[in-house]
């Protein structure tokens, strides 16, 4: 297709002027001089990484994780921090709920000596700290726990019973506008943990909604709905939760997939159990009766013992995980045993529409 040389000349002139004024890379052709692959950080769950399509949560984007109480929201974000720190990245935790347990974080593999932590007094202070860390370009992952705890200054200084209609929503809307561009420039991953509330008077559809207004829903590249679906028992003792995560929104890959995994109390996501299950499904691990074998060598009787063997032999665990990732995250194949194509009962939070 021929182009008008005068138009081409004018375009090159204006592109040069824009780059001179706003910096190199401020405008470019979509397929030119840039990698189309999004850099990601693992969530700690292989099936969730596969359900997300890109192998984890995307850098330079906003992510929202919401769900009921004790569903595993903070655990999931701590797993992300642990994975990021293993890659040498700097992480920060904005603890607006004042409830972060450093002992539990350490058990999940978080290097608490190198984790930046802030417990702000107001919502504005929390978001300003977020913005300052982002603009510095020195922090790679920021967690805000939680949006519901980001209390506007006017509400804190006022009295209980005072009406502050829409204050938190306006605060979040302004913060999103300010943060979105800075996050892209600094390639910082910002994760907001959010809580669920019930809409009053909703007779049809889903009455659930998230706090902080609609701005976060629009600006988030990924939204994850995390729910506890059952208990894991060792005889009569409950030792963990069966957990399901639905990818409600995804701007980097196909949305509406879901992943199921286990969260063990005091240990976090049962990643070795996932490896055993996925390894069997994709024929990397042989199962004969109750026995599991890898490359002809028995690794344990029963899933728990096979998982224990992988913990004690990290090189074999890494080998299986690498093989599974290359198998499941290449050639467009994005579905694993714990990551399904459709989220069956996935419901839009606003309309109540079932996907």
Swiss-Prot record:
Keywords assigned: ATP-binding, Cytoplasm, DNA damage, DNA recombination, DNA repair, DNA-binding, Nucleotide-binding, SOS response
Protein's GO biological process: DNA recombination; DNA repair; SOS response
Domain of life: Bacteria
Residues annotated for ATP binding in this entry: 67-74
GO cellular component: a single term: cytosol
Protein location: Cytoplasm
Gene Ontology molecular functions: ATP binding; ATP hydrolysis activity; ATP-dependent DNA damage sensor activity; damaged DNA binding; single-stranded DNA binding
A Pfam entry, by short name: RecA
Main location, first listed in the record: cytoplasm
KW DNA damage (keyword) present: yes
InterPro entries according to UniProt: AAA+_ATPase, DNA_recomb/repair_RecA, DNA_recomb/repair_RecA_CS, P-loop_NTPase, RecA-like_C, RecA-like_N, RecA_ATP-bd, RecA_C_sf
Record's keyword annotation contains ATP-binding: yes
Record family assignment: Belongs to the RecA family.
Protein's UniProt name: Protein RecA
Originating species: Shewanella piezotolerans (strain WP3 / JCM 13877)
Lineage: Bacteria, Pseudomonadati, Pseudomonadota, Gammaproteobacteria, Alteromonadales
